[in-house]
Curated annotation (Swiss-Prot):
This is Ig heavy chain V region 1-72. Disulfide bonds join C41-C115. Residues 55-68 are annotated as: Framework-2. GO terms for cellular component: extracellular region; immunoglobulin complex. One of its GO terms (biological process) is adaptive immune response. Gene3D superfamilies: Immunoglobulins (2.60.40.10). It comes from the Eukaryota. Residues 69-85 are annotated as: Complementarity-determining-2. InterPro entries: Ig-like_dom, Ig-like_dom_sf, Ig-like_fold, Ig_V-set, IgHV. Residues 86-117 are annotated as: Framework-3.
Amino acid sequence: MGWSCIMLFLAATATGVHSQVQLQQPGAELVKPGASVKLSCKASGYTFTSYWMHWVKQRPGRGLEWIGRIDPNSGGTKYNEKFKSKATLTVDKPSSTAYMQLSSLTSEDSAVYYCAR
């Protein structure tokens, strides 16, 4: 069997009228099937703990799928049932960074992932 990999593209979006609000994610990730990956989303320009952080998936040619959200203040999470065993959302308050860990990766996980305030 040949070596294969999974490509994850990362993007970010922020709502609101303040142009200084930024959500920064690194570029693409290349991982092996069965592995896990931790995606990051660093926020700036607003009070990180005042807004939920959402994560969304978009596969080529398909619509957006809401994965879940986390309250950076309390750490409380809510997940789309479909992603409960796939995604784990966490935050690091001191660095104003949200994380999403995806486990047991398959070709179905090859997508663009957005963090959104």
